């Protein structure tokens, strides 16, 4: 593929890792961020020690403080900013863009208040001629592994499969491989909702429970993710793929996962405000829990794990008691995930 100019919006761990993948493939990569010291560090020392202590980035990766400079004559834009600021950044991008580009995002969450998926936010904010070609990049991936070029397989989802194949082409190489999918709703809901289940799995670990309990919360968590996703219009088969069960396994079992670590700390009795302060990173599963709970209540979707975590985080219920209470819920058929 011809060399592309790509703006990566967000110099966090995942944005930095994806920037390196694109750079390895010979593309011109421009990272944009709003922390001056971090941008200077990337340009001058070729490091991003806020997230990676021992990683040296390629000198060809450039970082920008001015969004207009990062966007100048690019072929594609990759949003990797926290969910809560995606709309704000998209508005800024829309004001500055003077040509058509491919718009991608690699964040996982649901917007508080509106309950919207990130591609919907982008559709509402970017120029109309680009709205049908938004691509979601999502799947089982720890930035800590991708940055050292461990094998990673994820999904590129778009209503327009030709654009999804373009994204597949700019990212794929010997250690990083993308598969295409047209089910944007399924891929996005899987990526957002698995963070809630990861909090639950981490909490079980923090409370001292073993593998049986963790396997139960992950598999039953997948059932309620699917239940809500299908209600929203997703294809249930998507949840058996990379962006579904694959991402849930990675996030729900690993110490690399900030959502799992947050749950682990909650399970050990730490206060949420202390956990967020100590981590110094966005824990998307916390805000997504509230959004998912509200959607489930509105649509009448049975989500017991999400409800238990919501009650412990937002209503002050004891997390151990909330989780154990699920054991006394009505007995159900495993195969009737789409029914109450």
Swiss-Prot record:
Pfam families: NAD_Gly3P_dh_C (PF07479), NAD_Gly3P_dh_N (PF01210). NADPH binds at residues 13-14, 108, 143, 258, 282, 284. Pathway: Membrane lipid metabolism; glycerophospholipid metabolism. It is found in: Cytoplasm. Keywords: Cytoplasm, Lipid biosynthesis, Lipid metabolism, NAD, NADP, Nucleotide-binding, Oxidoreductase, Phospholipid biosynthesis, Phospholipid metabolism. Its main location: cytoplasm. The keyword Lipid biosynthesis applies. Its EC number is 1.1.1.94. One of its GO terms (biological process) is glycerol-3-phosphate catabolic process. Sn-glycerol 3-phosphate binds at residues 108, 139, 141, 194, 247, 257-259. It comes from the Bacteria. Belongs to the NAD-dependent glycerol-3-phosphate dehydrogenase family. Catalyzes the reduction of the glycolytic intermediate dihydroxyacetone phosphate (DHAP) to sn-glycerol 3-phosphate (G3P), the key precursor for phospholipid synthesis. HAMAP family: NAD_Glyc3P_dehydrog. This is Glycerol-3-phosphate dehydrogenase [NAD(P)+]. The lineage of its organism: Bacteria, Bacillati, Bacillota, Bacilli, Lactobacillales.
């Amino acid at each position: 593929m011809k060399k592309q100019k790509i703006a990566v919006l967000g110099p966090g761990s995942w944005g930095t890792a994806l920037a390196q993948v694109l750079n390895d493939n010979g593309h011109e990569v421009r990272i944009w961020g709003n922390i001056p010291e971090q941008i200077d560090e990337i340009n001058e020392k070729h490091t991003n020690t806020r997230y990676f202590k021992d990683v040296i980035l390629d000198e060809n990766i450039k970082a920008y403080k001015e969004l207009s400079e990062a966007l100048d004559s690019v072929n594609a834009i990759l949003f990797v900013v926290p969910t809560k600021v995606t709309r704000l950044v998209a508005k800024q991008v829309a004001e500055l863009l003077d040509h058509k580009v491919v718009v991608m995002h690699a964040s996982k969450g649901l917007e508080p208040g509106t309950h919207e998926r990130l591609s919907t936010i982008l559709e509402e904010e970017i120029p109309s001629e680009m709205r049908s070609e938004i691509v979601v990049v999502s799947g089982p991936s720890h930035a800590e592994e991708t940055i050292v070029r461990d094998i990673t397989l994820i999904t590129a989802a778009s209503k327009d499969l030709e654009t999804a194949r373009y994204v597949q082409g700019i990212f794929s190489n010997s250690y990083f491989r993308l598969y295409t999918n047209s089910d944007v709703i399924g891929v996005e809901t899987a990526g957002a909702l698995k963070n809630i289940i990861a909090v639950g799995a981490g909490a079980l670990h923090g409370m001292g429970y073993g593998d049986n309990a963790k396997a139960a919360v992950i598999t039953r968590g997948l059932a309620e993710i699917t239940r809500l996703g299908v209600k929203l219009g997703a294809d249930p088969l998507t949840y058996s793929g990379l962006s579904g069960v694959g991402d849930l396994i990675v996030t729900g079992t690993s110490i690399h996962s900030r959502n799992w670590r947050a749950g682990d700390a909650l399970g050990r009795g730490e206060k949420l405000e202390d956990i967020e302060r100590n981590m110094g990173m966005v824990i998307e599963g916390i805000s997504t829990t509230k959004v998912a709970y509200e959607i489930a209540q509105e649509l009448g979707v049975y989500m017991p794990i999400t409800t238990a975590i919501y009650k412990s985080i937002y209503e002050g219920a004891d997390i151990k008691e909330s989780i154990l209470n699920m054991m006394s819920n009505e007995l159900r058929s495993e195969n009737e995930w789409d029914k109450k």
